[in-house]
Amino acid sequence: MRSVSPQSTMARIPERRVRTLDFAQFRHGEPSGSRGFCRELVDCLSSVGFVKIRNHGISGQEIENVFVMSQLFFSLPQAAKGKAAHPPEANPHRGYSYVGQEKLSRVKDYEKGKREITDVYDIKHYPIDRDARQESYDQGAAVDNLYPNRWPDEQDIPGFRVLMETFYERCHEVHQDILRAIAIGFDLSPSFLTDLCCQNTSELRLNHYPSVHPSSLRKGAKRISEHTDFGTVTLLFQDSVGGLEIEDQNTPGTYFPVLSERKSDIIVNIGDCIQRWTNDKIHSTSHRVVLPEDTDALTKDRYSVAYFGKPSRSQLVGSLREFVKEGEKPKYNDISAWQYNQEKLVLTY
């Protein structure tokens, strides 16, 4: 994971186009078109770290239903959300986290060995914590017996559990297909990466960034500090409010916005584990959530849904020999995916 220079963390440039790919070319296209898609996908992820995909198999109505349910959940009284509360400590990483409970800024330079708590300018409207300005709900696979899910009461929000478990499985299918496409793009067996993720340990998250009035802001306010994701591939669904920015790979420390032309588009980004496996052939790109410059947007709530793909817990996440060229050295030592995730996770709570 690369460092973000303190002098340039607030540098911003106009929107640069993150390419949008048609996933139907991979799933339903001719073999030549499918392989071409895979190579283009790897090219996008290697150069930018992010890509948008459409025609991925999850319908617009399914996505809309999750956003509606997310708004209903976060509008519940605090006591109702608290019935599914995330514990004060990192584990189990399940349930509802209140505004400021998670502190992602603590791990933004983890691979550089910088693990101290960093101070960032944030929204003084919420004095709980200076690092994070969101509330969230996390769940894992229904079959994950190590970390069972924490659900709100059915009478408080009918249908929540069924809808969320179903959507999790839909995202899991897309995650597996993206891993296959990346493997093919590297001229490897389609199952090369999915075999490393056969235990379903991925997580689905609902995010709510409460509305903010301009009078409550100070210079440099952020909703979420710079960070990279822990796992393999992240699938992000976001509303029209905006605020997601990613680091320019050619100018470290400079960020540009990523907008969704359609709510049904999935924004895909690489996580740390694939960066480690590929020996930096693909980087996990630093990203953050800032407040939109549009004055009207400042008063709006922002919602997003993220699926964090992860390897099997026992799988090692050091550099794989398939990605270490002759004359190169492995950049990452072996460590289990579970231990790597835990070392970073415990810093965020």
Curated annotation (Swiss-Prot):
Catalytic activity entry: L-proline + 2-oxoglutarate + O2 = trans-4-hydroxy-L-proline + succinate + CO2; L-proline + 2-oxoglutarate + O2 = trans-3-hydroxy-L-proline + succinate + CO2; D-proline + 2-oxoglutarate + O2 = cis-4-hydroxy-D-proline + succinate + CO2
The enzyme's E.C. designation: 1.14.11.-, 1.14.11.57
Pfam family, one: 2OG-FeII_Oxy
Associated pathway: Secondary metabolite biosynthesis
Record note on cofactor: Binds 1 Fe(2+) ion per subunit.
Cofactor(s) it depends on: Fe(2+)
List of residues binding 2-oxoglutarate: 302
Keyword Zinc-finger: no
Superkingdom of origin: Eukaryota
GO terms, molecular function: dioxygenase activity; metal ion binding
Disulfide bonds: none
Entry keywords, A to Z: Dioxygenase, Iron, Metal-binding, Oxidoreductase
Binding site for Fe cation: 227, 229, 287
GO biological process: small molecule biosynthetic process
Record domain Fe2OG dioxygenase: where: 200-311
Free-text function comment from the UniProt entry: 2-oxoglutarate-Fe(II) type oxidoreductase; part of the gene cluster that mediates the biosynthesis of pyrrolopyrazines, secondary metabolites showing insecticidal activity. Within the pathway, ppzD converts L-proline into trans-4-hydroxy-L-proline as a major product, yielding a key precursor for peramine biosynthesis. PpzD is also able to convert L-proline into trans-3-hydroxy-L-proline.
Family note: Belongs to the iron/ascorbate-dependent oxidoreductase family.
Protein name stated in the entry: 2-oxoglutarate-Fe(II) type oxidoreductase ppzD
Organism: Metarhizium majus (strain ARSEF 297)
